[in-house]
Amino acid sequence: MAYTPNRVGNCLALQSMGNPSWPSEDELNEIKTIVSEMSKRSKEDVRIVVSPYRICPLGAHIDHQGGNVSAMAINKGVLLGFVPSGDVQVILRSAQFKGDVNFRVDEKLYPNHCSNKKEGTNANGHAKLQEDNNWGRYARGAVYALQKKEHCLSQGIIGYIRGSDGLDSSGLSSSAAVGLAYLLALENANNLTISPTENIEYDRLIENGYLGLKNGILDQSAILLSSYGCLLHMNCKTKDFKLIRPLYMESSLKSETQKEYQILLAFSGLKQALTSNPGYNHRVAECQEAAKILLNASGNSHVEPHLCNVEQEAYEAHKSQLETNLAKRAEHYFSENTRVLQGLEAWASGRLEDFGKLIAASGRSSIVNYECGAEPLIQLYEILLRAPGVCGARFSGAGFRGCCLAFVDANYAAEAVEFVRKEYMKVQPELAAQMNPETAVLICEQGDCAHII
């Protein structure tokens, strides 16, 4: 994979001065204390995996079709404190879920697909983390992935995992952050040297192989490859990626009129997808069916049915053969892929307002063409577009639960937060009342990639 390791602060027009603000020393010390008590080891022996959540400004729903995507880590996520267990035992506790998880890394693990009644998926195609006191399956999935790649594990871990309060099931890829945290901890405990690109595939083994889901590699890539202050671009067909920063920062020049933007997250209060939605896997199947028809029509029936394998010219020539739903899915893919490429240019040149307009268009296409989004999320998206200082918004995830993201002028951030909070209360009073008003709308910063402290 192509990789440009630009790891510099404030490399874009977001407020990104200094180092990431998360995790704090207090958070780290608290987790070290808990793991020390669990393991009867010194706090100095405790290691902590920092695995951030992510946002994807452009590239909605096209990673599984091999499209281009963009992403960045944020300063919220999962912290996993651990020590090597000294034997093959894994002992885990969670701040969010009840009950200890205990198993052995030398157990032979087999796929735990969602046909199992204890499993379920959310609208993003990820497994639900909390059902039936089965929250430890991502840890088992990490062992499964390492076993499948023929790594011999002799060390388990004693660990304590905590996600940022209120952000699980929020459309920020908490499940991918959890899976990667376990992978990094187990690899560290067993002295395994695994590259980020390998771990992208390992985490996909957790979700695709162990849990039987059909999601792509966007979330894992964003968490593992992001760099503080930069925008990650990934081609999901070739797996090539690069980190992008505006040209004016390359030359250490900044226009006096250049606005600074922050990331705004607005939560819907929906923790579970509505039962009437068609589901992530169904949308993936529709995209593949559209690709199959277009490839057959263009004489390429032997090619794997993904929309990335359909040339733009072939799509334009044969799209009339697609029935209405499939035509909409294909239109979303090709228009979104174009928006990503245009967005990369806007970002690189520091045109954040143009970048924001493309994000808003992405959100609209997700609703109209990809036909995803529960009513509360659609309302939240529309409120954000009216909020002071917001230059672009869309769902963070599939739009059936969780939150919406937006880029907001830093000078208007506080005003935008208050506007969104009040307007959402008007249209969804019951959902709004269920949330803590202090965390229902958040201002975030960029974060760094997953790493171990």
What residue ranges belong to the model's regions?
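DPxDG-like acidic metal-binding loop motif
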Residues: A73-K76, L172-L192, L405-V408
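Phosphate-handling active-site elements
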Residues: K149-I158, L186-Y202, D409-E423, V427-L431
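Gly/Ser-rich catalytic serine loop of serine hydrolases
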Residues: E131, S164-A177
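Glycine- and acidic-rich phosphate- and metal-coordinating loops
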Residues: E119-G125, V143-Y144, K148-L167
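Alpha/beta catalytic cores of group-transfer enzymes, especially the acyltransferase/condensing modules
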Residues: T193-I244, A393-S396, I443
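C-terminal nucleotide
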Residues: M1-L58, G66, L79-R137, A145-Q147, ...
